[in-house]
Regions:
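PAPS-dependent sulfotransferases, especially Golgi type II membrane carbohydrate sulfotransferases
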Residues: 1-2, 165, 193-275
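PAPS-dependent sulfotransferase catalytic core
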Residues: 1-72, 76
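Glycine-rich phosphate-binding loop used to anchor ATP phosphates in small-molecule kinases
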Residues: 69-95
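PAPS-dependent sulfotransferase catalytic domain
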Residues: 70, 114-194
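PAPS/PAP-binding and catalytic site of the sulfotransferase fold
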Residues: 15-29, 97, 174-199, 234
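Hydrophobic/aromatic beta-strand patches that form the interior of the parallel beta-sheet core
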Residues: 6, 30, 101-103, 173-175
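Conserved phosphate-donor/acceptor-positioning beta-strand/loop module used by diverse small-molecule
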Residues: 85, 96-119
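Short catalytic/ligand-binding loop motif for oxyanion handling, primarily in non-cytosolic enzymes
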Residues: 17-20, 38-42, 90-93, 110-115, ...
């Protein structure tokens, strides 16, 4: 039987591991770690481009190959439904299902940077300070933007914003980090409704570390505890943004939130900013 394959994109440090830690309590619905599947399917998608193939319509074959590849990837997994986390572009996602669904995790850009910095300060051996020896916020932010998947993730979210302005063939659910951590049970219930799969009685007070098909994250290459979940009840991590980031840095990076959030979301959540 074919799996239900959904898609997860969004910002780093925005609750990806937490979402997986919760959902993966359900044996019939699992969230993957950051997966190469999106890259594999995207490569197949690109192989149909070029002048050599333009004199024949290969659309049906393209869709069939993409779907069969995704199904083959997870064919040996026991779960019925999978939320695959990856760099899923809309043009690829729409070929994998008659009713494609994408979950987009959002978090304020300064909260993302602050979360990385807090983690790095608490774990001396880490990929950030190994490459940014100055440890200055401006240098850390520039590095993470390029190598920490920050800018790529923000632009991915913006790609969906622009796509949905002109298309309605992909269903999207936005989840903000503050909502996921502050209103967890309600968000998870809404997620089940969005995915149209049977709900599960989750334990929100004792969430174990992320595990997928019996494997846990090996963070030795990036730094200890990058994907470590806090024990006990779920809490929203907060940071003193004004203390961490001087005004000049704030002004330099504030516009990236326009990639992460829709104009309506910005107006509602951050109405102090004018656009």
């Amino acid at each position: 039987m074919d799996k239900n394959i959904f898609h997860l994109v969004g910002m780093p440090r925005a609750g990806n591991t937490l979402l997986g830690g919760i959902i993966n309590q359900n044996p019939n619905l699992q969230v993957s770690p950051l997966s190469p599947l999106s890259r594999v399917v995207s490569a197949l998608h690109l192989s149909f481009e070029g002048e050599s193939w333009e004199n024949f319509d290969w659309t049906s074959e393209q869709d069939t190959l993409a779907r069969k590849t995704a199904q083959a990837w997870y064919s040996d997994y026991k779960t019925k439904s999978i939320i695959d986390r990856g760099t899923w572009y809309p043009e690829v996602v729409k070929r994998l299902s008659d009713n494609p669904k994408v979950i987009i995790l959002q978090r304020d850009i300064f909260e993302v940077f602050a979360s990385f910095i807090k983690w790095a300060n608490g774990n001396v051996e880490n990929f950030i300070y190994t490459n940014v020896t100055s440890r200055k916020p401006e240098d850390v932010m520039a590095y993470l933007s390029q190598y920490g998947n920050v800018q790529t993730s923000a632009r991915m979210i913006y790609t969906y914003q622009k796509y949905l302005e002109e298309n309605n063939d992909i269903d999207v659910m936005y989840i903000d980090y503050k909502d996921l951590t502050g209103d967890t049970e309600n968000i998870i219930n809404n997620l089940y409704d969005f995915l149209e799969v049977d709900k599960f009685d989750h334990n929100f007070d004792n969430i174990k570390d992320f595990e997928f098909e019996g494997q846990k994250y090996n963070d030795t290459k990036v730094g200890s505890n990058l994907h470590k979940l806090k024990e006990g009840s779920i809490e929203t991590s907060t940071h003193d943004i004004e203390w961490l980031f001087p005004r000049n840095l704030y002004n330099r990076w504030i516009n990236m939130n326009e990639l992460i959030y829709t104009p309506e979301q910005l107006e509602e959540k951050y109405n102090k900013w004018k656009y």
